[in-house]
Amino acid sequence: MHGRKRLYGEALLLLTAMIWGAAFVAQSAGMDYIGPFTFNGIRMSLGALVLMPFILSKRRARPAGEKEDPKALWIGGTLCGIALFAGSTLQQIGIADTSAGKAGFITAMYVVLVPVCGLFAGRRQSWLLWASVGLASLGLYFLCATGGALAMSKGDLLVLLGALGFTAHILIIDHYSPKVDGVKMSCIQFGVSSVLALVCMALFEQPHWGAIVQAGIPLLYTGIFSCGVAYTLQILGQKSTDPTVASLILCLESVFAVVFSWLISGEKLSARELFGCGMMFIAIVMAQFSGAKAQAKQPRPKPQGNTP
């Protein structure tokens, strides 16, 4: 895996984190008008619709002889959709009982969960990467424990459980993304997630058209940018990035959530929160050095034919 390709993947993941950070503010605003299943069902549907033109154009422009693995595409997309539904639903329900900024911090706990799950899969991590995980976790503590103690409300706990869903999502992407077309896989995951959310909406919520219109701007932002654009960038970025490094970069969404909450909603950053943000940035740099060293030790792969 070449250094330029790795940096390109990390840049895509950083942009993803920025888009998601702003989405926490939009999600919090949307909950003032509609329920979590309605919100997620509509925004996931928008995400799938946004990607359809790109899929159709890529199909017409596909080079002759390019191979695809339909089975891996549908299995990976379906599993991603289920994991995304679980994570986003718990996060959306929990965000109604906590601040947008704090929800961003707690969601980023997948930075710890990804390498821990990797151990069960037999994936070894360097000491530098584990040090960056520890530093990022400590940074999350300073961000969450703004009152001097790590007090978990019901909303905080639901968002933390949602982080488990996002952990599974990252690991599933890591397994399937090298084998499939990233845009197609992203579209399938949104389709699966939206169907699950809309079924739950019909069972547990009674949305009104007027309320949906009032939540229009948050829905459009989260549907087009947070779903259609950002989740696709995540899949493309993870093609050339170690999953633990990817999780560390993506956890910067918590930092961006604080920044955008301050800029848009007027939430102020305390010195403690700024200190936590700084620790997380240092952890990201350490993780990137770790990823570069690990890839430098790997033998350069022999040239092969086109892969999907």
Model regions and ranges:
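Glycine-/small-residue-enriched transmembrane alpha-helix faces in small-molecule transporters
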Residues: 1-41, 82, 86, 90, ...
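Helix-helix packing/entry segments at the starts of transmembrane helices
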Residues: 40-42, 103-109, 173-194, 227-263
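C-terminal-most transmembrane helix of multi-pass membrane proteins
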Residues: 2, 44, 52, 56, ...
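Hydrophobic alpha-helical transmembrane segments of multi-pass integral membrane proteins
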Residues: 7-12, 38-53, 74-75, 129-138, ...
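Hydrophobic/small/kink-forming positions within alpha-helical transmembrane segments
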Residues: 21, 25, 81, 85, ...
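Hydrophobic/aromatic residues within transmembrane alpha-helices
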Residues: 30, 39, 43, 94, ...
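Specific transmembrane alpha-helical segments of multi-pass solute transporters/efflux pumps
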Residues: 19, 23-24, 52-107, 142, ...
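Hydrophobic transmembrane alpha-helices of multi-pass small-molecule transport proteins
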Residues: 51, 125-145, 166, 197, ...
